[in-house]
Each structure stands twice: as C-alpha cells, then as structure tokens.
C-alpha cells in the first residue's frame, strides 16, 4: 500500500511538471561539455559556419527579399565606411528618464552607444558575406569605440534610479546590485556576433580588445554571481531572456579561448527555459505583447546558437510551452491596421514579432498557424537575420476560431475574422494584479475596436519616467484602475498584489469564469471582485457578449451597500457626443452608439484625468473619459451597456426607443432590441452565483 501511494504521488508530480511545460531537466556544465566539441569549432560558428555561408550567399542571389536586404545594407555601408569614429565619449546624463540636464536631454550618449554597436554589427556581417576586409577593419573601429565605454549598462537601470523599483515575481525584495541591464544583454548578444564574424580578419590584439570587453562587461559581471542579479530568477519578466541570452552568447563565442564558460551557457539555458515555462498554456504572456516579443526574440538567438553547436541535443525551441503555441499570442493580439492590443505596458503601435523571429519560430516548431501569421500579416523582412532565418516553406493555415481565451493569464479576444476591419473586435482581461513591473490595475477591463480604430480604448502605457516603476505607478491613470474601463463604487479602486518591499498577496485579482465561442456569438463572464479592497465594492461580475459581427452587450452585476455611487467608466478613442440617453462615438470611418439599458435613473457624465510624467520636458495632458452613474437602490445593481455601429444619431435614437428589458421574478433578464431589419435578443438566466448568458 505504501509503495502504491508513493508511485501515485510521483505520477502526480510528474504530470504536473509536464502540464506546466517544464519538459527539460536542468542542464549542467558537464552536459554542455559533452554536447559541444570545442576542439572542432572554427569561427564563424554561432549562426552559420563556412559551409553554411554558401547557402546564405545563394539565398541573397536568388531570393528577392534577401537580395533587397543585402543591397540596402551595402548602400548604407557607403556612409559607415567614411564616417569618422569619434573616440570622445559623450557625457551620459544622470537622469535620462527625467530630462533635468542638457546631458539627459540631448541623446548624444545613447546615440553614440547605438551607432557604434549597430555599425560594428552590420559591417561585420557584410565582411562575412563579401569577404572584403575593408568592412572588417571599419567594423573593428566602431567595435573598439564601443568597447571603450566604461559600462554597457545604461543609467536608467543603475543605482539609485532603479533601487526603488518594485521587484517582479520570484525576485527577493532586497536588491542593491544593478550593474547589468537589458541594454547590456543586447550588447553582449550583438558583440558576441561581432567577435564571431570578425575573428578571422582581426589581429590578435584586436581580437583581444573585443574578447576583453566581453569578459569585463558581460561575463565577469554575472558569472558566479547570479544570486545578486534580480533578473536572473525573474522568469515572468522579459529581462530574464534578454540578459541571459547576452551572457550565454558571450560564453559561446569565447569557448575556444575559455572552455570553462560552458558553465554560463548551462545557466543561460536553464534560466531561459524557466522563462519559457512561464508562457501560458495557450502561449499568453502577462507583461503584454511587446514584452513577449522582447523576451522571446532575444532568447531565440541563444537558442539557435546552442542548438547548432550541440547538434540539436539541447534545443530550447522544443520547450513545450513555446513549441505548442509559438505565435498564438501575437496572432490573437493582432488588429487590422497593423496594430496590436496594447494592454499593460506593451505599446500596441504595430504587429507583434519581427519577421525573422516569426520565420524562426515557424520553422523550428513546424507550426502552421505561425507560418500563416508570417505570410498574411507581416511585411517583408529588413534585418540581416531575415537572411539567416528565412521564411518557412509553408504558407500556413489559419486557426479554426479567431476568438481566444488565454487561460493562464485570463486575457480574451472575441472577433468574427482576423483580417476584416469592418467587423468588431472586443477584447479584455481578468487575471491577477501581480505584475508590478509592467502590469496595470485593469481587471475586468475591455476595449472595442472597429474600422482600424479603438472606439473604447486602453490608454496604453505612460512614458517611462523615473517613478513609473516605483509604487507611484499605481497613481498614473495609465496604470490605475480609474484609467481603465472598469467599475468604481464610492470611488474605490483596484489594488496591487505587490507593493515596495511588501510580500505578494496572490489572492488579489480576478478570473474568467466562462468563455464560450461559436460562429454567431462569443461570451465571456469575469469576476474581478478580489481586485478591490471590497470595502465598497462587495462583488462584481461582468458579462460581455459579442453577437457577430458587430453588436456588443455588457452586463455588470455589482453588489454594494444601498445608495452607493456606482460608476461604469469608459475611455473613448474617438470623438464623443454625450446625450441624455446615449453616447455617440464618431471615428474616421464610422459611428458607434453606446446605449445604457437600466431600469432606474442614470446620468452620463464626462470627466478628465490629469496626466503628467515626472520629466522636465514632457508636457501635461488631459485624458478624457465618461461615466454611466447610478445610485444603488438595493444590494445588487445590474447595469447593461449596448455598443454597436450606427449610421447616425437618428438610428441610435430609434434603437433606444425600441429597446426593451424584462426582469423575471427569479431575477433572469431578457433584453430585446431592433437595428434596422434585424432583431436581437439577449437572455441572462439567474443562477445561484448570478446571471449567466444563455444563447
């Protein structure tokens, strides 16, 4: 009996590891030593070797996309080849995110940093593709200037600016060492390639110049000291991938001279694998799309190099969480008009994923949805890695359902079609308020996107000043719940699960209770109750229904004391006209009406957030919103909001006049409305826990 119990326990533990995606054992230095034949290595070897270079040259010759990238690079090199390389390092400002001084504002240091690094990198690649040593010598001039920098870490991430930042998940609060940041990780990754690509053309002193810089500014800052770097265990943070990739690639490129560096190669593998394990079971990433891209993109360079050097034995692309859903997140967050959902600090200004990254993920995982995303959404490549990592051979196959619930992070997207801008997209999120790094207090929030515009929007991120990552971030409207399309009861706002040097409270947040999708209707039910202190808001359930392709209905069930002031907040992304019984939203290519449906008196009132970055040059701005306001008459208040396209105000007025709401004795609710020749019915059945939408 005892043995049976032990076997059962071991089976459960094994299953939980597999389900979580932790499909690899920890890699040791010995494992790497056995897998890489260091004696056979000959530069270049990170991303291609001498033999494989022939295939790249053939691709440049025969593939128009690759040929265009290469010809553009050669044309740009005409400038770089005659550009003087300035050895006078500009002064770096002490507060580059506050812009107090001229050095903070002028951008000379960051320009110097970027120019020398980028030019060395691209000229080194040109040398490999042409064999012309003039490119190698000029690349070294830029590399030499970059190596002369005292540090490759930038001021915004050094003490004392970053000291007061709230530490992310799995990171101890007591952090005082900040000598390696994501800029340093990027620099390590790129300079590792410069060393690899220039090696054969350089004299020993020139090789040693770059080798010494990689050791001084990358390897010795981290090797043996991982416990003193906060990002080393921040597996839900993009920094983990960026920094570990840079360190690992520095180790790989220096293996001939320093074979002992297989220890940091193993460390990078293990830590990046742990980051990949934190991808959601559907591919979601809590920080948002932009930071999914940064972490996965930079990690893919290390993953590719290590896979090559170990002949596929140690392949991070086989991580279960990554392999099962390599591009689900960027695909489902995509919006017509070359945009993406901008929840959290993720930006949303373009589609997610560099073409070469999606090429690589699609090829390595053989995922047809990834190939379809590459061939149907992204533009032509314009990066040297679009030559090294070419398009997948398949054009791919679209997902069967364009709607998605990312279960691990509880984000959701409801839509009729990926490509058609004339069909409404509704998206929102629940989940936990436990990402103090890039998360917002936005549980229960949603947006409405149509005709390439947000009609109901997310404010996106604030500019990154010196306080935005401190506890003060939750006072910025961009991060506070008051700056999202949520509920306020007597002004009560959502709270964070993590504050500065305080323990996490993982109970704070919300959840998706139900997500259903079909050809004709999508439905989500969220419970954001525990995102609040619950002194005023006792309970909140939000149902969102999309009757495809364009009619959205939102039902908010709010429990509070009687006579509480309840506000349903909306942030418009277009022009707004407030009327007594409805709101007109006018975009560039169409109009929508937002119509409250209530059985009690309500008001629609406009307001404005104040928004001011802590920055000497950033201007103050107002941010518009409007509220549907009611005073609760009893413990439970039901507020219904209809959002749909209309021709004009007259059609909206007719919809208001024809709508009806019936509340049955058991509390079930039926809403009927007419739009033109179409009739719509929404029925919510009362259950023990609240109202449930029934098709």
Give the residues covered by each predicted segment.
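Long, well-ordered core segments of solenoidal/helical folds
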Residues: 73-87, 139-157, 209-230, 263-283, ...
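Well-ordered alpha-helical scaffold segments within catalytic/enzyme domains
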Residues: 43-64, 117-134, 138, 144-151, ...
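Carbohydrate-active enzyme catalytic cores, enriched for enzymes
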Residues: 254, 291-455, 513-521, 631-634, ...
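Low-complexity, Ser/Thr/Pro/Gly-enriched N-terminal "stalk/linker" regions
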Residues: 27-103
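Active-site lining segments of carbohydrate-active enzymes
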Residues: 172-290, 386-400
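CBM-like, beta-strand-rich accessory domains located in the C-terminal region of large
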Residues: 25-26, 467-695
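Solvent-exposed loop and edge beta-strand segments that line ligand/cofactor-binding
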Residues: 29, 45, 98-116, 155, ...
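Bacterial N-terminal signal peptides
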Residues: 11-20
